Amino acid sequence: MKVSDKDKKGLYSYDRYIAAHTIMFSFEGVPGIYFNSLFGKSNDEAKYIITGNNRDVNRYRWNELNILKRMKNKNTKEHYIFETFKHLLNIRKKQKAFHPNALRTNINLGNNFFCIKRISLDKKQTILCLTNLTSKLQNTKINKKFSKFKNLIDPHTKFQNLKSINMKPFETIWLSNT
């Protein structure tokens, strides 16, 4: 988790990492997550250099005591990433629109956003999954019908009767009608 063309100084490395996974969590099917990804572990490039085996890049071996210690410390990357993923996956598993076979529709909002709409099999729940793909505050207009939806990720956020949404760098919102 270093820098990218969208985050040249690496100021939002955790946010970018979580945004990438949140996008994956919004797709159909069951998300596959590498064990190391649960803790935000970077690729093990040193291991790859030693072995030359491409697969070794994501096969970091944890010391059980070390990871447990880092998980207990609320100030570590490992704790933050794991708790955030746990929060997102707990939300996801409760939503009918995130059923593996629920409908997905892509919505083009330009290069600064990733957006899809998920509709439950019974057509009763719609979730708009929206991610800011940049390191800047972005504003996007939203369809009037979505302005009364609630944000599943942060229920304290109110979007009542909005015509547009301001989104922080690499922020994701899941707007649901139920």
Feature map (PLM): residue ranges:
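C-terminal beta-strand-rich structural cap/linker in extracellular carbohydrate-active enzymes
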Residues: 161-178
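Conserved active-site loop/cleft motifs that coordinate metal ions or position small ligands
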Residues: 33-34, 128-131, 151, 176
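Short aromatic-acidic-glycine turn motif
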Residues: 147-156
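Surface-exposed beta-strand/loop patches in extracellular or lumenal glycoproteins
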Residues: 131-147
